[in-house]
């Protein structure tokens, strides 16, 4: 049964104009009872022991460590398909890094790329990992130095080790889902009477305050892991800070773990135009970083407490679609990302944007992309979804730039100016997402 957005969904379906290529869909049967659901969680320390170039502002090297960085990995197995979700305390990485890791992982284990979603928390106080990718095309001044190949190789190695460990630790489990709400973020597209939008605070602008929650329990009902999906830049700390930190996402995850006694994966959402309410401060005290334990951490805990009806009858399906959307004219590109662009039959340069999909039973729909998505787009996709729980996982499997709304491109400012996309991209992506969920059935 389609909810209130039925008319809009039907309008999207017959007008699907975007060139979409179905690459792979690993479907499970939703008509028969699933085998025993299993899950596991692993937490792997990736804190460097030497100074590193930090990613997120201008070039700067770390002078120490404030809090530890981790790969947090959840594995799930419904008896037919295994799925691995990773949350890493870094800012960004190029899709070519994801491709390299997946190639090595598949060679060692047989695990396919479709089975692994590697997200980052988007802290701006963590080391660079891998080549700059698309960032060098419009922020070349930040990358006059070489990336640390030794640290990059270690982070990749630790990720593969963590996924293999999670696969080996799978145990009987149950899954529950729910919502929370927190006022920890704010729209950062500030407007004045004249001139383009600028990075600041816009309390009247759109902001997604919902927390998407997935609770994994052991067979006895004890918490195994919590997945919390909330949209917010990891920018409480500004460029003056030189201490390695997970910023607000890392502080919140650590706090929730201490309170609940199990790992928590912070999965960032459509944070392209959302800042933390305290943003770009020179140090931990002035940025009130510890306050996010209350602003967001306690709200995650409260939402977890309300989740009921966890079930061991879990079935899921995985899918991927490629959206081909025009590439902005005169926009540079990274040499390690040639597989993500092409020239179409009309001679137009297009970006090949990979979207991932995960459906859990008949009530949970999750989509993911390597984007800094504006929150309105994820909120609209959620509104139009026929599923009661629809989540967007951002910064997933690499980074292919900012994706503003069509309405925000004319206002200019930082995000539209560095985006590789055109105003058409919002329609291209929304049509694909809505059509995918409509076609998957209930």
Language model regions located:
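Exposed boundary/loop context
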Residues: 1-3, 27, 205, 387
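Conserved beta-alpha junction segments in alpha/beta enzyme cores
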Residues: 34-119, 123-263, 269-271, 277-280, ...
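Glycan-recognition surfaces in beta-rich domains, encompassing non-catalytic CBMs
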Residues: 300
